[in-house]
From Swiss-Prot:
Keyword Protein transport (UniProt): no
The EC number(s) this enzyme carries: 2.1.1.182
Gene3D superfamilies reported in the protein's UniProt record: Ribosomal RNA adenine dimethylase-like, domain 2, Vaccinia Virus protein VP39
Pfam families referenced in this protein's UniProt entry, alphabetically: RrnaAD
Compartments it resides in: Cytoplasm
Protein name as it appears in the record: Ribosomal RNA small subunit methyltransferase A
Originating organism: Rhodococcus erythropolis (strain PR4 / NBRC 100887)
GO molecular function ontology, one term from the record: RNA binding
Family: Belongs to the class I-like SAM-binding methyltransferase superfamily. rRNA adenine N(6)-methyltransferase family. RsmA subfamily.
Metal-binding in keyword set: no
Keyword vocabulary terms for this entry: Cytoplasm, Methyltransferase, RNA-binding, rRNA processing, S-adenosyl-L-methionine, Transferase
Stated role: Specifically dimethylates two adjacent adenosines (A1518 and A1519) in the loop of a conserved hairpin near the 3'-end of 16S rRNA in the 30S particle. May play a critical role in biogenesis of 30S subunits.
Positions with a binding annotation for S-adenosyl-L-methionine: N44, V46, G71, E92, D122, N141
Amino acid sequence: MSDAEQSNEPIATPRGQAALLGPVEVRALAEEFGVRPTKQLGQNFVHDANTVRRIVTTAGVTRDDVVLEVGPGLGSLTMALMDVVDRVIAVEIDPNLAARLPKTVAERAPELADRLTVVEADAMRVLPSQIPGEPTALVANLPYNVAVPVLLHLFASLPSLRTALVMVQAEVADRLAADPGSKIYGVPSVKANFFGEVRRAGAVGRNVFWPVPKVESGLVRIDRYAEPPWPMDEKHRKQVFAAIDAAFAQRRKTLRAALSGWAGSPAEAERRLLAAGIEPQTRGEMLDAAAFVRLAGGE
């Protein structure tokens, strides 16, 4: 650990640049403040500066964006974001990490410290009223055990979010970006596509994390529809999502059978399917988000 780190003095950096965290700094911070990554919170800290810079570049955020970061951890990605944008709102569930992050930023990027706001909250339950301002972009290394519900909750709760670039487990990334008809297409695929266009945006190696995870990681990008093709209000979204859940709850059954409970009977399910222009013998994995919207009666 350097003298500057030991004395908690600000580290001298070029104006507008943060001293990003490397493996030594990540482990030192964790040890100094008793932070131990927990499986329960899905914590794996990125310690590679090139990786976090690549994430920021891939996200395509600019100075005017208000970036929401979920699970900032020790601040690796946070400080890379602060190099580029004027405002970062970091939502952290771990009180120790939430308390430490502003201090780390003040030490390693003192001239950028006023760009950061930390919100101690559970991202799966955080309310718009808890988040200052209107975030335009979500850029995050999401906790892998709750990545999909967090992503969907934030897009549903924060209509100001125009785009997201998130790092998740590679298998989850593939499912989110899957096309109708593929074996991995399912509930996450359709629900994410309800909000916008979804695509894979790259892979991330295991060796950039501490501790090293047992799974591969990938980047996913979601761009919210500039002109929503269907209503996005909560009532309509819940109706559509209920149809999606029912269709995939019994994945191998035809939609006529799978949707019988949702519709009230097989006959009513068939009537609704035909009214939406969907063949009743089709399976849910063949339908895109637009088809589920028609089925729920909201297009």
